[in-house]
């Protein structure tokens, strides 16, 4: 059988924020180890070592990885087969369940929107709190595993709708990672939201950044690069 590829997703976002992180740090990206966390209704986390992605949480499809708004994230394949047999679901029905009715929505029983779940958890809804706790647990698990995979880390980047706007998710995630040297500045963290870029660590250990993604800008630059390259090749052929 042909091997199945690991595509990964949000590649344009991860490339943009990792490059931007190197710029604001004043360092060559080829000398840095960065974990980029694109957190939104769909989420993925990537290990960028010396400018190259060496691992990413999403795989063949966007279903893999940490728990998301309506997606399960990583799940035991046998659990899928068990549910299909027990409930008599077709492959299409199972795909719909895993992709559109699970994740934060399925656990909370309320919504896939982080803002709704945040309010419900604050009001004492146990399922909403569980959904947020599961989300935080899985984010920190990926950060920890990628830090180990790269033999260390120089910076963490949060981006995406939740990554840029949820000070709570950032704080609770980093609070469980002090053994890696992370030291979050809570005051700085609480001031960054709604598209604001900034550094939120206390100045010791690996840096922690919030960097708004610009996928359209990155695509425009990549397109410009390709057009320039094609133009040079055409001119060389004419000459």
Region annotations inferred by a language model:
Residues 35-42, 48-49, 159, 211-212:
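Short beta-strand segments
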Residues 129, 133-157, 163-235:
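Internal helix-turn-beta structural module
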């Amino acid at each position: 059988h042909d091997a199945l590829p690991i595509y990964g997703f949000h590649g344009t976002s991860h490339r943009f924020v990792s490059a931007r992180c190197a710029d604001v740090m004043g360092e060559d990206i080829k000398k840095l180890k960065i974990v980029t966390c694109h957190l939104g209704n769909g989420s993925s986390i990537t290990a960028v070592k010396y400018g190259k992605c060496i691992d990413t949480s999403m795989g063949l499809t966007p279903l893999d990885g940490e728990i998301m708004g309506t997606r399960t994230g990583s799940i035991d394949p046998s659990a899928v087969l068990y549910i299909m047999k027990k409930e008599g679901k077709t492959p299409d029905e199972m795909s719909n369940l895993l992709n559109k009715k699970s994740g934060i929505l399925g656990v909370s029983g309320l919504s896939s929107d982080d803002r709704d779940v945040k309010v419900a958890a604050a009001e004492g809804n146990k399922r909403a709190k569980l959904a947020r706790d599961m989300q935080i647990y899985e984010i920190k698990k990926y950060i920890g595993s990628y830090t180990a995979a790269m033999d260390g880390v120089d910076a963490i980047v949060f981006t995406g709708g939740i990554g840029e706007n949820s000070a709570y998710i950032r704080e609770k995630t980093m609070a469980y990672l002090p053994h890696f040297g992370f030291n979050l500045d809570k005051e700085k963290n609480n001031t960054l939201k709604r598209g604001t870029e900034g550094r939120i660590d206390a100045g010791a250990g690996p840096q922690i950044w919030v960097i708004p993604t610009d996928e359209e800008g990155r695509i425009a630059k990549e397109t410009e690069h390709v057009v320039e390259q094609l133009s040079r090749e055409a001119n060389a052929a004419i000459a």
